[in-house]
């Protein structure tokens, strides 16, 4: 379906809220791992049986921080989506899969407030879908990729897979 006029112009902005949410989410998770102590995350990976837990903890933190910032500013989206997707898939399979789909497991409501159980893999799938959407559709206006493509004259529009 061909979009014309205003709808076509607005479509280009679709990636911006996805980039903001996904980029911020990865940065927040990476930052939390740093603030809580990388050794704590290393211990979690070791308990899950992840090989080279210390190296993998730091690699994950670096990917979440750097990759999250890259997604946030729309830089090198197809490239940074690969390690970020790998992190999501590993988390979904090794941590969240046994708890089912739902990301919210309300166990009970007490005087102290609601008590939740472990999250399922729903959020991992949503992040994967958002990354795939940005990769396929391009990072949109107000992105490093768009600026780079326009400045270098590489692509005729955005920098998504659809533009190659």
Feature names for model-found ranges:
Residues 1-36, 54-62, 66-69, 73-164:
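Extended, low-polarity transmembrane helix blocks
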Residues 35-55:
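Membrane-interface interhelical connector segments
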């Amino acid at each position: 379906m061909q979009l014309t006029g205003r709808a076509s112009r607005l479509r280009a902005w679709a990636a911006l809220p996805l980039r903001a949410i996904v980029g911020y989410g990865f940065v927040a998770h990476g930052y939390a791992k740093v603030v809580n102590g990388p050794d704590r995350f290393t211990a979690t990976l070791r308990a899950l049986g992840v090989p080279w837990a210390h190296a993998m903890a730091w690699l994950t933190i670096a990917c979440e921080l750097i990759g999250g910032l890259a997604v946030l500013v729309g830089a090198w989206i197809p490239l940074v989506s690969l390690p970020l997707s790998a992190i999501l898939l590993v988390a979904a399979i090794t941590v969240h899969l046994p708890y089912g789909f739902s990301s919210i497991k309300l166990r009970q409501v007490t005087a102290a407030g609601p008590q939740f159980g472990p999250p399922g893999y729903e959020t991992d799938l949503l992040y994967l879908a958002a990354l795939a959407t940005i990769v396929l559709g391009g990072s949109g206006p107000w992105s490093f990729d768009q600026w780079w493509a326009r400045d270098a004259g590489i692509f005729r529009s955005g920098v998504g897979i659809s533009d190659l």
